[in-house]
Amino acid sequence: MTSFTVTYRQSKCIEVKSNGTSYKFYRIPYSLLESGKHGIVPDSKFVVYLLKGKDKENRDCLYVGTSTNGIENRPTSHGDKKVAWETCIIFTSFDPTFLNDSKIRYIEDRLRCAIDETKEYINTTKSTSGKGTNDYDNEDCDKAMPYILEVYDVISTPGANFNETF
């Protein structure tokens, strides 16, 4: 297990610190994300998001995506698919300059691969591209991936509560 500390914040997020870097995770009901009534403004416009929901056969589905413009448009553009999205988990950084387009694409690709490996979910992500990243960015992301995966697993568990007030 990876060593990290978790702090619950009043800003509807959890802060995860490891190796001197801090990240934010938000869990937002998809209905609030769609309506824009979630009250969340991430510090960084670069985000990786994970949508959780059920398809028409009641199977668990996940979608991994990225946005270079925050959370207002891209995560909500999946409402017309054949999945009833229930939750959106947002990953971003406290430092608005730490994440960039290549890093979030790399993290997106790694998360998609991890979902495929579990075989527990229907992965509705068509394809991802971790290409275009440089060795320095990859190294930063590789250091963070073990606890990113652990935190996603914990906060995506139904009933997990980290002082949400929606």
Where are these regions (language model features)?
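Conserved catalytic cores of phosphodiester-cleaving nucleases, focusing on short active-site segments
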Residues: 63-65
